[in-house]
Amino acid sequence: AKMASDQGLIGFSCTNSEAIMVPTYARQAMLGSNPIAWTVPADPVDFFFDCSTTVVTRGKLEMYNKMGKATPDGWAVNKDGVPSTDAAEVLGNISRHEGGGILPLGGATEVLGGHKGYGNGMIAELFSSILSQGGTSNKCMVGGKSNICHGFMAINPEFFGDPAEIKKHFSQFLQELREAPKAQGQDRIYTHGEKEHESVAKVKAEGIPVLN
């Protein structure tokens, strides 16, 4: 996606992955973390939104498992579709295809919008495995072989108007977001991509930190 915005285009990319997401009201993992990324040219930094469509990724569960800690509530369910904070149990069930998995972004039910994370996961599936007629998340790892699919798109803003004016209009709105009234105790409102831009600049200036 960033390759597109570097050329003044709106970029989109997504991928499916081995099934870890339990659809809303299901108890079997059927979708991957299925991340989606959008990038849009803007000043002073490009808008860069990149997220999984699950509450967390598999790596977060693996980290909690290594530390021997219970995961926060609302991350996963066991093979019966019951909430679980046991990372080892959930990871084992996913690996053995015994049921359970990680919840969609928004959680287990429709109350806090779990169906929306599920739907966004389906959008990633559509633009990766369905349009390419490849392996869907529940079938992309067969016999130890990967058949993961990807989707990419670049949109030329010239189709809609003057690219410079569109960029200026979007940049102005992003600045208005940054300057919106802040919640109590907060001193800054970020737009997507700012933290990453600042992190990259810091690493270039100071080097990559190494933990002992």
How would you name each of these model-derived features?
Residues 1-31:
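Long, hydrophobic, well-ordered secondary-structure blocks that form the structural core
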Residues 12-15, 39-41, 49-52, 154, ...:
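Short beta-strand segments
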Residues 6-10, 16, 43, 54, ...:
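Generic secondary-structure signature for well-ordered alpha-helical cores
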